[in-house]
């Protein structure tokens, strides 16, 4: 049965419609937020998937270009693979809902959000997040929700809930926040060096709005929600776990306390073989369940050690960072490079400087724009000791690259100050946790090595969490998580920023949410960590950006011309600009507002091209004298090029003081002569006089 529900969200009406569309899904809803419309659905398989040890959830955010009245480009004329923005939005929706499903559920669950109409003032990502929450909550799929979501902006010191397009352009931060009525489940932020306390207060304000959304969704569930289905738990049988625990607990404790990752993995692997052999007769054909029990035991040992001993399995204090090191100038031919190491995590980042014509064009359902600063993140198999081939970036790689990108954008000089495009690439060479934050630190090193005048160094670090499952009020937060603490812990709270404030946040959790106190502690830990990394490591490796760019980096000269003169510089069919490029060997980019960028490693060539362009763009005025080149001779005079692409006629009567019988008696093609502009007629033709120029030259000499 069709039902419609509405609430006010940030001064605009949010409407949820159920019981009409996509009725074969387990749950579905149409979300209207202003003129933004999202179709959200949640579907579960009838039976669990065999042979897996994880919850098979997929979340998709599908952009349709008809939502903004566009026809896709290219030959096929239909949407292709998801855009980077769509992938990142899928991840933002996935992270707050995933921890709220039962951990032992093995039925496939697919959540699909289709963007059908977009009004730029009303964020489709928030409408999709709320839509996903509604679709799952009213379905029969087990779920400990609902969640709500908002975007936070900061304009003139005021926190704005779901800022419109104009407010987003002015905002010092863009924070996507999600949570249940009781706790925060997801934070994704980009900020212009916002102090930690300001960010914390904004999160608390945003949560107040989220509580209203959760109440709204709970009201919908009461009216149209289905009873949740029962499922077969995939958890380890209690009797098996007790036997495995009795046999392997002490050995597992010894194994996980090995400080070296490879040594620890080897000991755990050996213990697995011993346990399988010892229990094979008692539990026949239960090899996979024994492995699951050992995994559960390893997790228990790691968590107990942190909670009870108050320190880490590698011997560190809770607020202690692993051994740090940093180097710059690793690769001689790149424009800049930096190597950052934190324990057994090692990231090499390079920077390549390019012309403004190298910026990335972003053409999707958002307002068309360009991206000048790009960061790509690579995570090869060898970084974790695995023999596997690379199949291109997945969602994780794209997400980590975007996080590192957001972290550095606030400190990049403006286009006016430094007219370059940037491409950074982070190669993860070793991974034992927190590679995305290693990429942030590597980016700072590479940019400073390249001579980019960044506003301040940026560092990134993560905070971890272990909550006592029997007493949730007992928890421990700690700084700089390594891989095993990420696997078995409850939180990966990544924060990047300068010594003055935050530039990016990404929060992943495995529990049903975080209290304000946990978030406060995470902010304090990561702030301390940022300061230590910047002051003790980055600034000791390279105290300030290099004064000069790499000799292999292109040099850019900029100038401004009248936009009306752009067509003259380009010429018919690009003839003039191609001629300049051929003569000088430079690369030229021209913006619509008349900004011209000349890029080349050869400064002399750049100056030559600049002179030509300025000459073309210059207005020719009657009375001016030019040194021009004879380019064509006729019976009635000579055509002289006085500026690139601009020539005028010197009539035979104006060639000399005395009478001239034949043009060739005075000038030849290729001669350079002084000429004076006598007239520009109504048709734009330029009349020149050599005779007047000679007379003017003589007058000057006499003076």
UniProtKB/Swiss-Prot annotation:
SMART domains reported in the protein's UniProt record: KH, S1
Cofactors: Mg(2+)
Start and end residues of each S1 motif domain: 623-691
Residue ranges annotated for the KH domain, each copy included: 554-613
Record-annotated membrane-spanning stretches: none
GO biological process assignments: mRNA catabolic process; RNA processing
GO MF terms, alphabetically ordered: 3'-5'-RNA exonuclease activity; magnesium ion binding; polyribonucleotide nucleotidyltransferase activity; RNA binding
Entry annotated with the keyword Cytoplasm: yes
EC number in record: 2.7.7.8
Keyword Metal-binding appears in the UniProt entry: yes
One GO term describing the cellular component: cytosol
Pfam families: KH_1 (PF00013), PNPase (PF03726), RNase_PH (PF01138), RNase_PH_C (PF03725), S1 (PF00575)
Family (UniProt): Belongs to the polyribonucleotide nucleotidyltransferase family.
Job of this protein: Involved in mRNA degradation. Catalyzes the phosphorolysis of single-stranded polyribonucleotides processively in the 3'- to 5'-direction.
Full protein name: Polyribonucleotide nucleotidyltransferase
Source species: Ruminiclostridium cellulolyticum (strain ATCC 35319 / DSM 5812 / JCM 6584 / H10)
